[in-house]
Amino acid sequence: MSWPLDRKNKSRICNRGPKPCGYWGSTFRFRVALLVWLAMSIAAVPLSAQLVRGSMDVHWNAGAENCKAAPQPPIQVHRYETQTFILRQNLCVSYEGNFLYLLIGDQRALLIDDGAVSDPTEMPVARTVLDLLPIRGDSRIPLLVVHTHGHTDHRDGDPQFASLPNVQVAPFDLKGVREFFGFSAWPNSMAHIDLGERVIDVIPAPGHHQAHVLFYDNRTGLLFTGDFFLPGRLLVEDTAADKQSAARVIEFVKTRQVSRVLGAHIELDENGETFAFGSHYHPHEHSLELTTDDLFTLPAALNAFNGFYTRYGNLSLMNQNRMLAVQAILALVILTFIVWSVRRLWRRRRRKRTAVPVNV
């Protein structure tokens, strides 16, 4: 069978209508290509569009110059979203001003760090956290308490949780951390915590502390960095380990949508200057949240780190142990000089007193 010709355009006419014969085939292919493109576009929608968004519209308590004259609540609670809470310990109770993070899943909840104060009368961490947990049946959902690392200001609240029902406190030493989370190849593997429809990734990041870990929440895109990365002094105990951790964390971040980077302290003012060690008053603080762009500057800062103290952009890196050792040596040198000067002066005076006058 031959198709009739369009005498004017010299093209064959299909029986489906006055269109060139190739029209219907090309239209079908176009529609298929369009559907494939739409499917690929939907699949390629950034994960950030699927994240649960929260609010950081909060003004953190700045402490006080005179805490006795200005008593304040020991804990400030901010609801980031319905199942995520940020708690800050008041600077007047502890100059560390720790941030704690409560993440609630369908089956259990996770508390990241429990702060710098063990006395529940001064800092009622356990009571505050339990009051935020939802009730399932006749009791509140189980709670798991973990630590970004083992420094005391991140685990001194452990005793408040130790004897509570439906509460488990994770270990903080290196051996305990590796076994509890089930890392297959520390520090080059990850672990996961399933809270029920909410999975938390656990990323090893030794350097500040040998058992330091970060937590990434797949629900909100929040990355909790503890003392590894924060708006303040980055205390580096092991530079080589910290460099390797920074590289691993950045590679991890490139595969995830990170909405905010949240550390454990604020030690900078809004101009990027550090508050004095031990200060109970932080007026005009830097924001708690950092970005992945901030995080991406860490490798260069670590490469520039001289092992003692380095300022790199807004980052202040220091090895606290070495700085304390240098200060101790300087103090010893100064004390030695003072003692030597006093003894020398005393000997001069003694020689003058005992000198025999010469008769001419």
Predicted regions and their residues:
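Bacterial N-terminal signal peptides
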Residues: 33-44
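Conserved beta-strand hairpin/beta-sheet module of binuclear metal-dependent hydrolase folds
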Residues: 74-135, 215-227
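Metallo-beta-lactamase
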Residues: 109, 116-118, 199-206, 210-294
